[in-house]
C-alpha cells in the first residue's frame, strides 16, 4: 500500500436519523472492495485480493468477499489500521420550494421531487431535507448532506422558530385564537400554534396571517386550522430561525455559507 491514509473513522462521522439514512442512498452500504477503492487505497480488484487473503476486518471480524459496509457506522481495518471513509464535502442549500414538489429523495407517487430543482453538480452527493413542507405548501426548505445539522434543525428540543405566511378563505374568528395557541388533539397527537399575527394590530377578522411555530409536526398548521373548518388558500414558509427567504425567487436555490447556516440555529 502506497501513500495510504488511515484515521479513526469515528472522528469523521455525522449523526443521522434512521429516516435520513433511509433517504440517503449515497450513504448506503457499498461493497467492501468499493469502499477500499473509494478510500484511495487500491483498485477494486486489489481490494478483493486483500479480502480473500484475510487482511481486512469489519468491526473486528475478518471480512468476507462481497460484504457491504456503512461508511459512517462500520470500522474497517486493513492490516490492523483503520481506513478513512471518504465522506463528501458538506453542503447546505436553501430552496424556495414551489407548490407541487414533494420533499423526498424518492416517492413513486410524487409527480415532482424537490431535488429536481437542483443542478447535477449538487446531486453528486445525496442530499436530504432537514425538515419538510407538504406538497401543497411552498417556501423555505433546507437540504443538506450534513446529518448533524439536520438533526439539530429537526429535533423537537431545539425549538427552532419558523415563520409562515398563511392565507385562509374565511376571516379568523377571535374565539379560535386562544384555542389554537393552547392546542388541540388530532388523531391522537397534540398540536398547537405558537403565535398568530397579522399586519394589523389584531389578527381577528383577517384572512392573511403570520404563523409562528417552534416545533412543526406533520402538516401541523393545516391540521389545526382544518380542525376549526378553515379552508387554506396558500401556505408559505418564509424563515427558519434567523434565515429568511428574502428575494430568493420561487423555484430557485442558494448554497449557504457558514454565517447563514449559523442563522438557522438557536444562539
PLM regions: where:
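Basic, flexible Lys/Arg- and Gly-enriched helix-loop patches that mediate nucleic-acid binding at interfaces
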Residues: 3, 9, 15-267
Amino acid at each position: 500500500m502506497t501513500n495510504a491514509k488511515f484515521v479513526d473513522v469515528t472522528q469523521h462521522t455525522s449523526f443521522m436519523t434512521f429516516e435520513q439514512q433511509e433517504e440517503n442512498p449515497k450513504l448506503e452500504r457499498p461493497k467492501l472492495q468499493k469502499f477500499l477503492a473509494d478510500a484511495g487505497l487500491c483498485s477494486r480488484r486489489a481490494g478483493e485480493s486483500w479480502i480473500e487473503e484475510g487482511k481486512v476486518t469489519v468491526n473486528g471480524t475478518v471480512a468476507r468477499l462481497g460484504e457491504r459496509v456503512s461508511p459512517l457506522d462500520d470500522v474497517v481495518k486493513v492490516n490492523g489500521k483503520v481506513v478513512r471513509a471518504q465522506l463528501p464535502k458538506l453542503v447546505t442549500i436553501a430552496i424556495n420550494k414551489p407548490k407541487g414538489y414533494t420533499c423526498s429523495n424518492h416517492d413513486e407517487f410524487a409527480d415532482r421531487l424537490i431535488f429536481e430543482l437542483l443542478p447535477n453538480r449538487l446531486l453528486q452527493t445525496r442530499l436530504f431535507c432537514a425538515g419538510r413542507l407538504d406538497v401543497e405548501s411552498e417556501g423555505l426548505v433546507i437540504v443538506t448532506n450534513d446529518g448533524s445539522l439536520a438533526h439539530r434543525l429537526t429535533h423537537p428540543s431545539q425549538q427552532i422558530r419558523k415563520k409562515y405566511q398563511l392565507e385562509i378563505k374565511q376571516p379568523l374568528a377571535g374565539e379560535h385564537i386562544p384555542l389554537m395557541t393552547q392546542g388541540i388533539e388530532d388523531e391522537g397527537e397534540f398540536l398547537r400554534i405558537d403565535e398568530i399575527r397579522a399586519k394589523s394590530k389584531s389578527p381577528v377578522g383577517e384572512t392573511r396571517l403570520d404563523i409562528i411555530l417552534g416545533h412543526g409536526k406533520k402538516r401541523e398548521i393545516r391540521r389545526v386550522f382544518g380542525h376549526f373548518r378553515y379552508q387554506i388558500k396558500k401556505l408559505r414558509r418564509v424563515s427558519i430561525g434567523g434565515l429568511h427567504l428574502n428575494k430568493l425567487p420561487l423555484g430557485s436555490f442558494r448554497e449557504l455559507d457558514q454565517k447563514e447556516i449559523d442563522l438557522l440555529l438557536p444562539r
